[in-house]
């Protein structure tokens, strides 16, 4: 456990330079909490920043952010909680999630902000984040019995963020065995800005109870908004 309670200055927990890798294996538990800066942060370079979590647990609780930078985060048969961040839970890492439980909840801005997001036979929850619950800039795949729940997000009414935003021209797929629930969020439920979303026959897709109370995303699409809004 790394706990910054009582620390002075603005320390980071783990700072990655160049081709650094963090490997958690064989039942390891890493808890990082109460850092005024980020739990995991890169140096902004072009190295291979990898976080590999296998048969283990990672918890980021009440830090400025959980994952800051463009990491390749591979999560296999593990549990990951990124909760209570002052800012984003993550901000653009690539997440490959398999046979795992992942929670990005109660973060001060976005929850699970990803480049590529692959969810395979896993449970992913993004709940009560002030920004988007899930935002994906590249390919998005939910497959092999995965269950994804996005609820209570987009709580900051000064933004026009949706609960789920699929941003660029990539394929987005929910396969026939999987479930995606986007419910009771505080703005548009699902925003498909570009690309193609395929929900296969047999999948469960439930988008209910989302509300739009302002015009920052053109004031439309409490359920689904397709096309360019005001770049949110």
Annotate each PLM feature.
Residues 19, 27, 123, 139, ...:
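Tight coil/turn sites that cap or link beta-strands
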Residues 21, 50-52:
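Short linear motifs in low-complexity or flexible loops
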Residues 5-18, 33-47, 57-70, 79-94, ...:
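Extracellular beta-strand/beta-solenoid scaffold signature
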């Amino acid at each position: 456990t790394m706990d910054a309670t009582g620390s002075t200055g603005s320390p980071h927990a783990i700072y990655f330079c160049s081709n650094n890798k963090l490997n958690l294996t064989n039942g390891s538990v890493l808890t990082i909490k109460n850092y005024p800066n980020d739990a995991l942060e890169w140096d902004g370079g072009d190295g291979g920043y990898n976080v590999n979590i296998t048969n283990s647990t990672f918890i980021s609780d009440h830090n400025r952010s959980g994952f800051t930078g463009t990491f390749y985060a591979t999560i296999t048969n593990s549990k990951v909680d990124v909760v209570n961040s002052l800012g984003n839970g993550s901000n653009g890492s690539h997440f490959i999630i398999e046979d795992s439980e992942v929670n990005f909840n109660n973060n001060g801005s976005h929850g699970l902000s990803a480049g590529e997001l692959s969810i395979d036979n896993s449970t992913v929850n993004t709940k009560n984040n002030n920004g988007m619950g899930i935002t994906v800039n590249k390919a998005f795949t939910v497959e092999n019995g995965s269950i994804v729940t996005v609820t209570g997000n987009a709580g900051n009414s000064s933004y026009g963020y949706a609960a789920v935003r699929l941003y660029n021209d990539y394929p987005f797929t929910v396969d026939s065995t999987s479930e995606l629930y986007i419910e009771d969020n505080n703005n548009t439920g699902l925003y498909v800005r570009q690309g193609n979303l395929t929900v296969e026959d047999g999948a469960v897709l439930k988008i209910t109870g989302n509300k739009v109370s302002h015009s920052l995303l053109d004031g439309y699409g409490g359920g689904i908004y397709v096309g360019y809004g005001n770049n949110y």
